[in-house]
C-alpha cells in the first residue's frame, strides 16, 4: 500500500444552529458544498466573498480544494459557520497567519443563540398584554 501524500486540514465552524465541516487540501481551486458547486449552493456574490475571505488572505485561492459539508440553520448562519471553519483550516496550514485572521475577526465564534421561550409569555421576552384595572 502506498501512503497518501495529500495533506488535508479539517475544521469545524458553528453559528446559531448551523454547523459546517471544512476540508482544505492542496489542489486546483475546486470547491464542493454538499455535492454542489459554491455558485449553486450560495448564489449571492456577497456570501461567496464572505466565505472565501480567509482563503484570500493566503494569496492564491486556486491552489486549494475545498470540500464543505454544512447543515442546519439559515443561509447566513451557514455562511458564517463555513467562514469560521475555513479560517480554522487555514490556521492549521499556516500558523503564522493567526494574528491576521484574528484581527479580521475570522477566528471569533459568535456565541449568540436563540433565547428559549419562557412559560407565561408569548415569546422569549414578549409578554401578554397587561391591564392594571
Curated annotation (Swiss-Prot):
Keywords: Ribonucleoprotein, Ribosomal protein. Gene3D superfamilies: 3.30.230.10. Belongs to the universal ribosomal protein uS9 family. GO terms for cellular component: cytosolic small ribosomal subunit. PROSITE patterns: RIBOSOMAL_S9. It comes from Chlamydia muridarum (strain MoPn / Nigg). This is Small ribosomal subunit protein uS9. GO terms for biological process: translation. SUPFAM superfamilies: Ribosomal protein S5 domain 2-like.
